[in-house]
Structure formats: structure tokens, C-alpha cells
Amino acid sequence: MLVFLSLELGMPQVRTAGKAIPTVYDKDAPAQVPTYLQTDGRWGALPYAGDDIATSGCGLTSAAMAYTSLTGEEWTPLRLALTVGDMCTTDGLNDMQKFCAWMRANDGSLSSTGLLYDQQEALGYAGRGWMVFGSMTGQLHEGGRAYGGHIVLICGWDGGTADIRDPDEGQVNLNTDEFASVSWAYFIAIGSD
């Protein structure tokens, strides 16, 4: 049996024995949040923010995970870095407000907040399906690496557990008390209702 993909009329179709079978997508299915690591060999050594992605790309990597989830299109840290360069940094640091502005400019369905300082408000956005960037210092979790400054992506909240993508460590889940014990500086949420 011969099977191939066709893009006739802009709609992907599978053809088998000359008959087109339309490809069906579940548009209502929630988008998955990928786990990208800033140290990944595919992009870690790429120059970024005066250093490289492995060293300085926590915000870029978090933005790539968020934008991939929000758009349903794959935006790896490599692709995002090649697209935005250093324009989403300020004084060599990741500027999540600039990343949010870039995302909104490229997808008119997205909205973002200003800086948020209330943990419960940030978790509320994560519980609604928005992507929330969290700026923190110290350890994200007991036994984890200590950071002088770090950006993570809070991508879920079920009322008791925060689902976090740490671009340095991967997926981390924190309960309410663990989340409250993190030294958070600010949050910024982006998404659509």
C-alpha cells in the first residue's frame, strides 16, 4: 500500500490507493508544554546575552517553551534565539516583558500582564492555562541548584501543585508550601482567555 502526504488546497491529507483521507486535528485539545533545557547540545553553545544559551539563556529557553505551548508550533530555543537575537535582553539580562511584547506582536490572540508580585495571582493565571514567567533567586526546590537570578516557566496550577519547567533542571512540581518558600522577585503571565 502506497501512503504519502499531500498539501492540496492547503489542507494536509493522507493518500492511500489514490483516495484522499483528510487529516483531522483536535483544536480543542490542550497544547503540551515541552521541556527544553538551556544546556542542550543543539543550542547551548549559541552566543546569547554576552555569553551563551547554556549560561545566560534561562529566560530565552522559558520563552521558547511558553511560545511553543501557546501557538502549538515548535519554537526551540535555537529557533527563538535566531529570530530575536538579543533584542529581548536589557543590559545582558533576559527581559521577560520584551519577550511577551514580541510574542503579542507575532500572535494577536495573546495578552500579557505587567509585572506581578503576588504569588496567588500568578498561580491563578497558571491555573487558567496561561504561561507564567517567574524570576527567582536561591533554590527552586530542596536540594536544587542555587541561582543568583533565574527565570522559570510556571505552566500549571491545580490548586495544590504548581507545574514548573526549569530550563536548567527540567520539570519540577511544587506544592503550595514549597512554592511559597521560593524567593520570587516577580512574575509575568501571557496567554489568552
Annotate each language-model stretch with its function.
Residues 67-193:
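Conserved active-site-adjacent core of cysteine acyl-enzyme catalytic domains
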